[in-house]
C-alpha cells in the first residue's frame, strides 16, 4: 500500500501542483501503511458517502489540506458533519492519518488524487455542503500562473458539486491571487459572494489559522478569505 500510494502519479496535464519527493518520517510512513486502509478511499471506485460514513450528513471537501491539522480540527469541532480531504503529497497525508487516529475521529476520509479529477469523476453534482481551498499554491511567477487551481472552469465545476446553499470558501496570503480569485469567482453565475461589499469576507470561525497563514503573517502578508454560496 505504501509504495503504491507514494509512487502513483496521475496522467500528465497542466496541474495546480508538482509532485516532489519530500521527506517522509518513519511515523508518517507507518501511518500510510497501517492507517490508510481505515481512512483512505480509492478514487477509481464509486463514492457513496452514506455507505462510507454509515450515515447521511453534510459533507465538506477540503482540497489540498497540507498537513491536515486544520481539517482534523474542523472535523473534531463539527462531529455531526462528514469530511473528505484531497491531497497528493504523502508526508501530508501521513501526518493527517496520525492526527485522525490521535483524535479518535471517524468522520474524515482521504483521497490521494488531483482535486479536479476527484470532482469530475467521483463527486456527484449537488453532493457537497462545502468546498474549502485554503492557501493553494500561488504560482507567483508569470509563466506559471496557468497552473493556478482557481480558474473559470474550476469555479464552474466546483459550483456544480455544491448543493443549493452550499459554500465555496477559499483563502490565500497572496494579494495577486486573491484578486484573480475574486474576479473569477464573482464571474461564476451560480456562486454568490457573501461579503457585504462583494469582495472579501472575515475569516469564518470554522477556519482555524494554518501554519501557512501564520508564516505569511510573520512575513507581513495579508490574508484574504473569499466566501460564496451556491445559488
Swiss-Prot record:
The record's keywords, sorted A to Z, are:
Methyltransferase, S-adenosyl-L-methionine, Transferase, tRNA processing
Chain positions recorded as S-adenosyl-L-methionine binding sites: 62, 87, 114, 137
Report the pathway entry. tRNA modification; N(7)-methylguanine-tRNA biosynthesis
This protein's record includes keyword S-adenosyl-L-methionine: yes
Do you know which Gene3D superfamilies this protein is assigned to? Vaccinia Virus protein VP39 (3.40.50.150)
Q: CDD domains this protein is in? A: AdoMet_MTases (cd02440)
User: One GO CC term of this entry?
Assistant: tRNA methyltransferase complex
Q: Which reaction does it catalyse?
A: guanosine(46) in tRNA + S-adenosyl-L-methionine = N(7)-methylguanosine(46) in tRNA + S-adenosyl-L-homocysteine
Give me the residues that bind substrate, please.
141, 173, 210-213
Catalytic-site annotation from UniProt: 137
User: A single GO molecular function, which one?
Assistant: tRNA (guanine(46)-N7)-methyltransferase activity
Asked if the keyword Transferase belongs to this entry, the reply reads: yes
A Pfam family of this chain: Methyltransf_4
Its Enzyme Commission number?
Answer: 2.1.1.33
Q: Would you identify the family this protein belongs to, as annotated?
A: Belongs to the class I-like SAM-binding methyltransferase superfamily. TrmB family.
What NCBIfam families does the annotation carry? tRNA (guanosine(46)-N7)-methyltransferase TrmB (TIGR00091)
Q: What does this protein do?
A: Catalyzes the formation of N(7)-methylguanine at position 46 (m7G46) in tRNA.
By its UniProt entry, which HAMAP family does this protein fall under? tRNA_methyltr_TrmB
UniProt protein name = tRNA (guanine-N(7)-)-methyltransferase
Upper taxonomic classification of the species?
Answer: Bacteria, Pseudomonadati, Pseudomonadota, Gammaproteobacteria, Methylococcales
Amino acid at each position: 500500500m505504501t509504495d503504491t500510494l507514494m509512487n502513483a502519479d496521475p496522467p500528465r496535464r497542466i496541474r495546480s501542483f508538482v509532485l516532489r519527493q519530500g521527506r517522509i518520517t518513519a511515523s508518517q510512513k507507518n501511518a500510510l501503511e497501517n492507517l490508510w486502509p481505515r481512512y483512505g478511499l480509492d478514487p477509481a471506485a464509486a463514492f457513496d458517502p452514506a455507505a462510507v460514513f454509515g450515515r447521511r450528513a453534510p459533507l465538506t471537501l477540503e482540497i489540498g489540506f497540507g498537513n491536515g491539522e486544520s481539517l482534523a480540527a474542523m472535523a473534531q469541532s463539527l462531529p455531526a458533519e462528514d469530511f473528505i480531504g484531497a491531497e497528493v503529497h504523502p508526508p501530508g497525508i501521513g501526518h493527517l492519518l496520525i492526527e485522525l487516529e490521535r483524535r479518535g475521529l471517524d468522520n474524515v476520509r482521504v483521497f490521494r488524487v488531483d482535486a479536479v479529477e476527484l470532482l469530475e469523476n467521483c463527486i456527484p453534482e449537488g453532493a457537497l455542503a462545502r468546498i474549502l481551498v485554503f492557501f493553494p499554491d500561488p504560482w507567483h511567477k508569470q509563466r506559471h500562473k496557468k497552473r493556478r487551481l482557481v480558474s473559470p472552469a474550476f469555479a464552474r465545476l466546483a459550483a456544480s458539486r455544491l448543493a443549493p446553499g452550499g459554500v465555496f470558501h477559499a483563502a490565500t496570503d497572496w494579494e495577486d491571487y486573491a484578486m484573480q480569485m475574486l474576479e473569477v469567482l464573482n464571474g461564476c453565475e451560480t456562486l454568490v459572494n457573501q461579503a457585504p461589499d462583494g469582495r472579501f469576507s472575515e475569516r469564518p470561525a470554522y477556519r482555524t489559522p494554518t501554519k501557512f497563514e501564520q508564516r505569511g503573517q510573520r512575513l507581513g502578508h495579508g490574508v484574504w478569505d473569499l466566501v460564496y454560496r451556491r445559488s
